């Protein structure tokens, strides 16, 4: 049985630049720092950076595939400021259907990986669908609503 996400790994073109970015934006120091790898914990999740300087990174910028980190709404402005200071590519927000979806900031790291900080929760999203589109809820039990 799968117990959760073990870790995420991103290939990076410049280790020093990537480490500086993640350290500044997420206010976390690396746990492991080598010439070709770095490990962080962000919100309790293990993030690994591996040096791969020769990968074509053009296509990565065309996908909505991303990782979203939870953040308190009261912390959004400070986080946005850190993104600006780090020189992040901050993207326009995705249009939300309703306020209950939470607020987000989408941004790219120096290698083009799409990241998001998001204030909403799965429980809030499920409650929204339960009220507005109950036919969309399939295989939902009380455990999933927590």
From Swiss-Prot:
<dbReference type="InterPro" id="IPR051332">
    <property type="entry name" value="Fosfomycin_Res_Enzymes"/>
</dbReference>
<feature type="binding site">
    <location>
        <position position="66"/>
    </location>
    <ligand>
        <name>Mg(2+)</name>
    </ligand>
</feature>
<keyword id="KW-0046">Antibiotic resistance</keyword>
<keyword id="KW-0479">Metal-binding</keyword>
<dbReference type="Pfam" id="PF00903">
    <property type="entry name" value="Glyoxalase"/>
</dbReference>
<dbReference type="GO" id="GO:0046677">
    <property type="term" value="P:response to antibiotic"/>
</dbReference>
<dbReference type="GO" id="GO:0000287">
    <property type="term" value="F:magnesium ion binding"/>
</dbReference>
<dbReference type="InterPro" id="IPR037523">
    <property type="entry name" value="VOC"/>
</dbReference>
<comment type="subunit">
    <text>Homodimer.</text>
</comment>
<keyword id="KW-0460">Magnesium</keyword>
<feature type="domain" description="VOC">
    <location>
        <begin position="4"/>
        <end position="120"/>
    </location>
</feature>
<feature type="active site" description="Proton donor/acceptor">
    <location>
        <position position="116"/>
    </location>
</feature>
<feature type="binding site">
    <location>
        <position position="116"/>
    </location>
    <ligand>
        <name>Mg(2+)</name>
    </ligand>
</feature>
<dbReference type="GO" id="GO:0016765">
    <property type="term" value="F:transferase activity, transferring alkyl or aryl (other than methyl) groups"/>
</dbReference>
<dbReference type="InterPro" id="IPR004360">
    <property type="entry name" value="Glyas_Fos-R_dOase_dom"/>
</dbReference>
<protein>
    <recommendedName>
        <fullName>Metallothiol transferase FosB</fullName>
        <ecNumber>2.5.1.-</ecNumber>
    </recommendedName>
</protein>
<comment type="function">
    <text>Metallothiol transferase which confers resistance to fosfomycin by catalyzing the addition of a thiol cofactor to fosfomycin. L-cysteine is probably the physiological thiol donor.</text>
</comment>
<comment type="similarity">
    <text>Belongs to the fosfomycin resistance protein family. FosB subfamily.</text>
</comment>
<keyword id="KW-0808">Transferase</keyword>
<dbReference type="InterPro" id="IPR029068">
    <property type="entry name" value="Glyas_Bleomycin-R_OHBP_Dase"/>
</dbReference>
<dbReference type="GO" id="GO:0005737">
    <property type="term" value="C:cytoplasm"/>
</dbReference>
<feature type="binding site">
    <location>
        <position position="7"/>
    </location>
    <ligand>
        <name>Mg(2+)</name>
    </ligand>
</feature>
<dbReference type="InterPro" id="IPR022858">
    <property type="entry name" value="Metallothiol_Trafse_FosB"/>
</dbReference>
<keyword id="KW-0963">Cytoplasm</keyword>
